[in-house]
């Protein structure tokens, strides 16, 4: 860019930019003669070359138009197939949804049935454990009461035989009533 600026600066300082009107000095006559000779001598060659070029261009355009028509035809066929595929996909979706509904309903019924069975089993197990714990607690309370009663009776009556017989008889009666 700097060189470009220097060229214009030199031209502006020295002579400036101008038009050379001397025909002999510029070589315009030589260029015109050369172009004339080329046209005269190369007319047949250039004409046939241009004709071949024109023919190849026309052929290329016709081929391109044929390919365009073929591509348009294939595009329309592909669009038809796409619309048919969309119809098939929507039918498959509808069938899938209805099948899901049927499966969910049957699964829900089976799950409800399984849940009811499991709940019944859990409830029976709970009641069985509750009854077992109740009996164990009852047995422990009876043993504790009997031990305390024996201890109090021994303190009250001492080691006498009659007291022992009375206590044993009372314990046997209580055991029979509680069990």
Curated annotation (Swiss-Prot):
The keyword Membrane applies. Disulfide bonds: none annotated. Keywords: ATP synthesis, ATP-binding, CF(0), Chloroplast, Hydrogen ion transport, Ion transport, Membrane, Nucleotide-binding, Plastid, Thylakoid, Transmembrane, Transmembrane helix, Transport. Belongs to the ATPase B chain family. InterPro entries: ATP_synth_b/b'su_bac/chlpt (IPR002146). This is ATP synthase subunit b, chloroplastic. Its main location: plastid. PANTHER family: ATP SYNTHASE SUBUNIT B, CHLOROPLASTIC. It comes from Trieres chinensis (Marine centric diatom). CDD domains: ATP-synt_Fo_b.
């Amino acid at each position: 860019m700097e060189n470009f600026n220097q060229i214009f600066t030199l031209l502006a300082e020295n002579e400036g930019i101008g038009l050379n009107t001397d025909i002999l000095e510029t070589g315009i006559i030589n260029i015109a003669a050369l172009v004339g000779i080329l046209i005269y001598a190369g007319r047949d060659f250039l004409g046939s070359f241009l004709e071949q070029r024109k023919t190849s261009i026309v052929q290329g355009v016709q081929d391109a138009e044929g390919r365009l028509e073929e591509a348009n035809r294939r595009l329309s066929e592909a669009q038809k197939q796409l619309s048919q595929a969309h119809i098939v996909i929507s039918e498959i979706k509808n069938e899938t949804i209805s099948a899901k509904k049927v499966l969910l309903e049957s699964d829900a019924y089976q799950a409800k049935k399984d849940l009811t069975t499991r709940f019944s089993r859990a409830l029976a197990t709970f009641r069985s454990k509750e009854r077992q714990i109740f009996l164990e607690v009852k047995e422990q309370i009876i043993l504790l009461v009997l031990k305390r009663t024996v201890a109090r009776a021994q303190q009250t009556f001492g080691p006498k035989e009659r007291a022992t017989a009375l206590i044993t008889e009372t314990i046997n009666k209580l055991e029979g009533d509680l069990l």
